[in-house]
Amino acid sequence: MGRLFAQAGGSGLVHPGYGPLAPVRDLATGLPLLQLPEGFSYTSFGWAREPLDRDVPTPGAHDGMGVVAVEGDVVTLVRNHEVVAGWGSFAPAAASYDPRCGGGTATLRFDTRAGRFLGGHASLGGTVQNCAGGVTPWGTWLSCEEFVSAAGPVTLSNADHVLARDHGFVFEVPADGVSRAEPLLAMGQFKHEAVSVDPATGIFYLTEDTDPEAGFYRMIPKVPGQPVRGGRLQMLRAVGAPDLRSGRRVGERLRVQWVDIPDPLAGADAFGEGLGVLRQGLAAGGSRFTRLEGVIVGDGRVYFTATNGGDAACGQVWAYHPGAEVLELAYESPDPLELDYPDNVVLSPRGGLVICEDSDQPVQRLYGLTRGGGLFEFCRNHVQLEGQMGFAGDFREEEWAGACFS
């Protein structure tokens, strides 16, 4: 896929991609779960309720995921579970931040040559709404909470609970073993979506999934590669452009500055909205985005998506050039039929982006975006079950998430 991304141009859905899509049967279950171009195959694994180590059932609400280690043909992945519930942690006590909470991560091992799932274990628990995150250059996973609250009474999934600890943080998960379940406080307390690290500088870039206003952040660590040691949190300011939610032009380039966040831990505001960090950044002159989701560093750029940004409110893809301190609008969807609500995003090793869709459309799609701005549909969710794998229903409207390369 990467070679096509790197070589092709054009714009919109005029790009042919790999050709028409048709149902393809899963190599593991024999079910036609996806629609793909001719010649592509896939294997499903890690279904909800399937046992992990210690016979722990795999939680539902699969979300962000990344490859944290490769040993020969075996890849190790860490996957988020965006659970918003107070039924308790599924991870061991030592890896549980708040024992009342049901979100967290699972670490998985897969043999790519044999096409076989080797097993997995709970590696972080006691968190809430672990949405996306990101892989670090040193081989760990950063898991982001998209939920902000002070300790105390709270409603989770329409049920009343009492949180033992504050929430709205990023946690680090190793490739082997389990997380220390220690929040990385320098990354702030806000509705985190994703994070990506620039290997050249060690700077962390973070997105915030709030509507109608959101910020794009960076954290400059005191010690590169050791975010637990602290750092400086800042929000992006596009000079002369305080509002980037709409009214922008594809290819437009804006000069970037950064404003400091005085108190990164003041996210749980008095209004109960979890917008304390955002308000600090905007008051200091930071620029407004809306519903920032995926972020990935590569090719000397930092790409990130605004799910409902743009004049049609169908989504934007932004590219920040840290070397030049320039922000560029790389793509904007003009219509929900073209692309609706881009979410998780990953850079192909050969260039170009893979974009996960999370919209109100009846079928969710996986897209490729070439360096030249050409967009094409690569895959469709085709999951319809009648009791197979323990599930029944039409799941074609469920979001894509966790796209990654090994």
Segments from the language model and where they lie:
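Sequence/structural signature of beta-propeller domains
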Residues: 1-406
